[in-house]
Regions:
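A short, structured surface patch at a secondary-structure boundary
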Residues: 75-138, 177-180, 184
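C-terminal terminal-structure detector
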Residues: 133-205
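Short, glycine-rich, amphipathic interfacial segments at transmembrane boundaries or analogous
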Residues: 43-81, 141-159
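Alpha-helical membrane-protein architecture signal
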Residues: 2, 6-9, 57, 78-82, ...
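A hydrophobic, helix-centered structural microdomain
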Residues: 1-65, 176-205
Length: 205
């Protein structure tokens, strides 16, 4: 399978050629998050990965502390729980940066179906026949569904995930990574309505 060598080549190359930028991001982002409310820099979720394996994910916090106690699990448009800096992180998807650690560990790939919180995955498996089929591939930071999906309907996401699983190849991954990079540069990752909030299955440090 090409996935593991593909991920390691890209990850290693990025850290070599973009080291100054990555060092800046890893320094500035935590400082801004902490200085805004002296709260935690990361939040942690347990998600469901390939073949149902559970793993721990860290992301930069984009919502106020204890967001799960202040509103619904699902993020709404113009959600007041999202901080001002959190909006920037979400638009650029830089809140996902800590998940590169999961790529190093082999739990996540650059491209693949989005890993869902355990409870969300279990609930959707109960209501949508065949939803567990998306677990046949390693989850990804970005993917076919994340790039092309214009709706939050789980059945549509499943259709896109299965389409990727059945056709995945290095050239498709490169294409999806390129589109994702453009979205990050232009700040187009801002459609989070109806998706799981930062507080879903949150585990406090």
């Amino acid at each position: 399978m090409y996935k593991r060598p593909f991920d390691l080549i890209i990850l290693t190359s990025a850290h070599i050629f973009l080291f100054p930028l990555l060092l800046l991001l890893w320094t500035v982002i935590p400082l801004i998050i902490w200085s805004s409310d002296r709260g935690s820099i990361f939040y942690i979720q347990i998600r469901t990965g390939e073949k149902g394996k559970k793993f721990k994910v860290r992301k930069f916090r984009t919502m106020v502390e204890n967001a799960d106690q202040l509103g619904p699990v699902w993020t709404k448009a113009k959600d007041p729980r999202i901080t001002r800096f959190g909006k920037i992180l979400r638009k650029t998807a830089l809140d996902e940066l800590p998940q590169t650690l999961n790529i190093w560990k082999g739990e996540v790939s650059f491209v693949g179906p989005r890993a869902l919180p355990v409870k969300e995955q279990e609930e959707l498996e109960k209501s949508i026949p065949g939803f567990n089929k998306r677990l046949q591939a390693k989850p990804g930071l970005t993917g076919y569904s994340q790039v092309y999906n214009t709706t939050d309907e789980p059945t549509v996401k499943l259709e896109h995930d299965l389409k990727y699983i059945n056709t995945m190849n290095p050239f498709l991954d490169i294409k999806l990574l390129f589109i994702s990079l453009i979205n990050t540069i232009l700040g187009k990752w801002d459609s989070r309505e109806g998706k799981s909030s930062d507080s879903y299955s949150n585990i406090k440090n």
